[in-house]
Structures are given as structure tokens and as C-alpha cells.
């Protein structure tokens, strides 16, 4: 068995003296593990850091075997990502989210979303938008997508400002007004008709509150898990970075 694919490094686990088990989210083959010989060497180590995109050749005698990876670097962004707090926390959290996907099950859209997020992670607020959207996409990919395109009560497609915490459906301003204190805010950057510009710190927190609730309910708690520490670390790092920027 042999295939070649591009993959984003999610993590690395030492195996023996100089080898390691590498976990990738690949474009065509999903989340996939393989053994890398010489992983601790000076040439390989920089390539195998979380957040990098690599070209992987996987070989195994049988498909169900762990197999071996031969790795070449494509986009080595890990050092830049790890140089700021929101980057370090963000990469760790994104890897934890990607691990929610079934192993060896192709998820090309999630690969593309992850790559796009990592390529546009320099500014803390923009990185936060990417992560909220990635969490939303993970929910949809696992069968728990939210309906944010029309009002659950009236069918309206405009002025959607709330989300029902029960159904996960959007609610318009007029329909939701009597129950506003029971509904979740829908941040502007998650509305299909609006772009990313002009979001506030509160919009970002509202986005994380929204996706966090449904991730816990539908994905994490049924697996006996909670949110990763990196998620809280990322949110705090973004808040601090934006506060510093506001003082400049």
C-alpha cells in the first residue's frame, strides 16, 4: 500500500530512540498516523512541528497497519505561529478539534479550512474568527450543524441576530425580541450576508460562547471530554492582544 498526499501536522509522539508517530490531517486521506524514522534529527525536527504543511508518502504492507511516512516540508509556518501566544494556543486547539474527526475518513473541506486559517493567523482578532468558524464547521462535519441562514420561527433570511440554544437555529430580531434574554447572540461575522470587518471583542466572545455550547453538548460531553485548556488560553491571549492594540 502506498499513497502521496499533503498534510497538516497535528502532533508528534516519540517512538523509540529516534523515531516518532506523526499525526496529520491530510487533504485526501483524512486524519492519518504513520511512523517517521529519524524524527528527532536536525533536518526532520523543524518540519514535524504542529501547524506545518508537509508532503507525505505513506507506505504499509496492509492498509490497516500503522505504516511509515516519508516527509518533505511544504509550508513551514510553525515557528511564526508559535512566536505569539494566540498562535501557540490556537494551533494546539485547532489540532484538538481536528482530532474529533474519525481517523482515516476523508474530510477535504476541513483540511482546506484548517490550511486557510493557519495561513491567516497573524492578527489575533482574525485568528479568533477563523477558529470560531472552524468550530462551527466541525459541528457540521460531525452531523450537528447549526442553521444560521434563516429564522427558525419565521423563515426570514435578514436581520438574524440570535440563535436558539435548544434548536441551534437562527432567530430574527423581531421574532426573538420577547425572549432575547434566553437566546444566544449571533455575531455579525457568522452571518452569511456580512464580511469579517468591524467585529468587536464582544462579538468574538459571543462566537466562542455559541460554538462552545453546542460542541460541549453534542460532541465533547458524549465522549467524556470538555473544552481543551488551549481554547481558554487562546481566548485570553486574543483578549490581551486586542487590548494592547487598542492602547496604541
UniProtKB/Swiss-Prot annotation:
This is DNA repair protein RecO. HAMAP family: RecO (MF_00201). NCBIfam families: reco. Involved in DNA repair and RecF pathway recombination. Gene3D superfamilies: Nucleic acid-binding proteins, Recombination protein O, C-terminal domain. The lineage of its organism: Bacteria, Pseudomonadati, Pseudomonadota, Alphaproteobacteria, Hyphomicrobiales. It holds the Pfam family RecO_N. GO terms for cellular component: bacterial nucleoid. Keywords: DNA damage, DNA recombination, DNA repair. GO terms for biological process: DNA recombination; double-strand break repair. It comes from the Bacteria. Belongs to the RecO family. SUPFAM superfamilies: ArfGap/RecO-like zinc finger, Nucleic acid-binding proteins. InterPro entries: ARFGAP/RecO, DNA_rep/recomb_RecO_N, NA-bd_OB-fold, RecO, RecO_C.
Amino acid at each position: 500500500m502506498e499513497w502521496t498526499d499533503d498534510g497538516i501536522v497535528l502532533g508528534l509522539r516519540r517512538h523509540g530512540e529516534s523515531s516518532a508517530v506523526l499525526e496529520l490531517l491530510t487533504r485526501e486521506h483524512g486524519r492519518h498516523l504513520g511512523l517517521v524514522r529519524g524524527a528527532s534529527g536536525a533536518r526532520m525536527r523543524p518540519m514535524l512541528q504542529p501547524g506545518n504543511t508537509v508532503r507525505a508518502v505513506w507506505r504499509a504492507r496492509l492498509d490497516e497497519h500503522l505504516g511509515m511516512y516519508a516527509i518533505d516540508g511544504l509550508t513551514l509556518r510553525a515557528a511564526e505561529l508559535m512566536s505569539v501566544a494566540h498562535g501557540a494556543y490556537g494551533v494546539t486547539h485547532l489540532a484538538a478539534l481536528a482530532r474529533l474527526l474519525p481517523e482515516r475518513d476523508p474530510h477535504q473541506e476541513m483540511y482546506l479550512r484548517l490550511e486557510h486559517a493557519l495561513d491567516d493567523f497573524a492578527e489575533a482578532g482574525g485568528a479568533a474568527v477563523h477558529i470560531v468558524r472552524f468550530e462551527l464547521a466541525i459541528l457540521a462535519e460531525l452531523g450537528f450543524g447549526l442553521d444560521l441562514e434563516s429564522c427558525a420561527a419565521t423563515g426570514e433570511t435578514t436581520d438574524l441576530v440570535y440563535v436558539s440554544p435548544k434548536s441551534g437555529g437562527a432567530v430574527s430580531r423581531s421574532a426573538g425580541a420577547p425572549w432575547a434574554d434566553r437566546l444566544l447572540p449571533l455575531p455579525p461575522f457568522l452571518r452569511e450576508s456580512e464580511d469579517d470587518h468591524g467585529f468587536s471583542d464582544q462579538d468574538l466572545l459571543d462566537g466562542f460562547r455559541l460554538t462552545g455550547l453546542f460542541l460541549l453538548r453534542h460532541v465533547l460531553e458524549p465522549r467524556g471530554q470538555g473544552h481543551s485548556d488551549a481554547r481558554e488560553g487562546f481566548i485570553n491571549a486574543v483578549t490581551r492582544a486586542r487590548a494592547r492594540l487598542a492602547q496604541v
